[in-house]
Curated annotation (Swiss-Prot):
SUPFAM superfamilies in the cross-refs: Adenine nucleotide alpha hydrolases-like (SSF52402)
Swiss-Prot/TrEMBL GO biological process terms: cysteine biosynthetic process; hydrogen sulfide biosynthetic process; sulfate assimilation, phosphoadenylyl sulfate reduction by phosphoadenylyl-sulfate reductase (thioredoxin)
Name the UniProt record assigns to this protein: Adenosine 5'-phosphosulfate reductase
Organism annotation: Bacillus mycoides (strain KBAB4) (Bacillus weihenstephanensis)
Highest taxon listed in the record's lineage: Bacteria
CDD domains, sorted: PAPS_reductase
Length: 234
């Protein structure tokens, strides 16, 4: 088994010459390699809809973890209900932070997402994912290379130093148009906020729509000199 400790660059290769640009091959390898010791961390953005559809073809009972920060858009929670109906066999786990919003406010002050967004992300996203990955050998992410400068060197199989795990990224070669083409082709549900200027959807407190020509991450933590929550730093 390929692990964080035994990982070597280019230790596994995949053909990109298929309709899914290698994604199905990567997922088939991942579930064969890690069996039930791999989880997909899904934010339920549009890339997530593609991955859920592909994962359902490879492993219909796969584990999917959603980091429920308690401050997501209502549209996101409604989408999760639709996904459960569409893919009833998937094991979708809604992971909660240890602190409620009230407890967080008492310890760190009101509106921590404004005063210290890095700490807020750590409490409500990073620590819960750490706990979710503790019993896993690998995890799956929907990162695409064209999303941002920080993601353009992502590989199919990555040594994730942040979580000391293997991170599997099947969609690295997909473009924004290809993601949407797949969603429409398979009539997949998606967050309606995508239709009103939100290419990347996170917590309601820290996500704004993006103007024409903007980077897909521009609406995240606008004005905070921050475009990543910390889950994907290497």
């Amino acid at each position: 088994m390929l692990t964080y400790e035994t990982w070597k660059e280019n230790s596994v290769s995949f053909s990109e010459e298929d309709e899914t640009k290698g994604a199905l091959s990567v997922l088939s390898w991942a579930y064969n390699e890690y069996k039930d010791e791999i989880v997909y961390a899904c934010s339920f953005g549009v890339e997530g809809m593609v991955l859920l559809h592909l994962i359902n073809q490879v492993n219909p009972s796969a584990k999917v973890v959603f980091l429920d920060t308690n401050v997501h858009f209502q549209e996101t929670y409604e989408l999760i209900k639709k996904v459960r109906e569409r893919f009833p066999s998937l094991n979708i786990i809604e992971k909660q932070p240890e602190l409620t919003l009230d407890e967080q406010a008492k310890l760190h002050g009101e509106k921590l997402w404004e005063s210290n967004p890095n700490l807020c992300c750590s409490i409500r996203k990073i620590l819960p994912l750490e706990k979710s990955l503790a019993a896993e050998k690998a995890w799956i992410s929907g990162l695409r290379r064209e999303q941002s400068e920080t993601r353009k060197h992502t590989q199919f199989i990555n040594q994730d130093r942040r979580f000391q795990s293997i991170k599997v990224c099947p969609l690295i070669h997909w473009t924004w148009k290809e993601v949407w083409r797949y969603v429409y082709k398979h009539s997949l549900p998606y967050n309606p906020l995508h239709d009103v200027g939100y290419p990347s959807i996170g917590c309601e407190k820290c996500t704004l729509p993006v103007g024409d020509g903007g980077n897909s991450r521009d609406g995240r933590w606008a004005g905070k000199m921050k475009t990543e929550c910390g889950l994907h730093f290497q």
